[in-house]
Amino acid sequence: FILEAPGGLISIKAEVKNKITKSVEIENLSSFVDLLDAKLKTESFGEIIVSTVFGGDTFIICNARDFNLTIEPKNAKKFVEISKEIIKIANHEFGFSHPTIPSLDYISFCQFIEPVQVNSSQQKEGWNTVCIRPGKLDRSPCGTGTSARLALMKEKNEIDVNEVFISRSIIGSTFETKIKEQFISNGKKMIKPLIKGSAFITGKQELYVSKNDPFPEGYRLNDTWPDF
């Protein structure tokens, strides 16, 4: 079936056994690298090498080792604090260029990664954490973040089409991923990411619309978030 996500429409395939969903695989939006291995000068950490990538949203991807950090829960606060500086400087120095969405000229998230390794099942895997302003990080491997990382890996010849990559989060949860295809669109090398994972029901919510509600379809305001 088709799901409407913030970045667009994505294809969903569920694996069901005995009326229980075992896993769900999504075919995410086309993902691509905007800047590869660019130099970014920071006040706190000097010059670092980063890449800017689209995976359904915009990311700046950094190597956690450049900050003498490993991706584990005890370093969560440090990653969040560092990401604020990185995103602010990167948006000032780089911004973002999307071939078909000119308004998407900014970087939304900072993703820290560790080098790709080969696990005991002879599959490539890698740790990551995605920081979300003003002070959060994704406890999952992040679907859009993983899509961005796959695009970066393909650009660096670290992965082949249809090769499995296990994306591992800061708490150790995983997505099984691979690249369905690579192609050229609007002058950009792009990939189609496939991401498989599972989730668990933790609650149920019911929403109502009153016939007397003056705003039955909701309302819209401009951005009220402060700059960071």
Predicted feature residues:
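Active-site proximal loop and beta-alpha junction motif in alpha/beta enzyme cores
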Residues: F1-F228
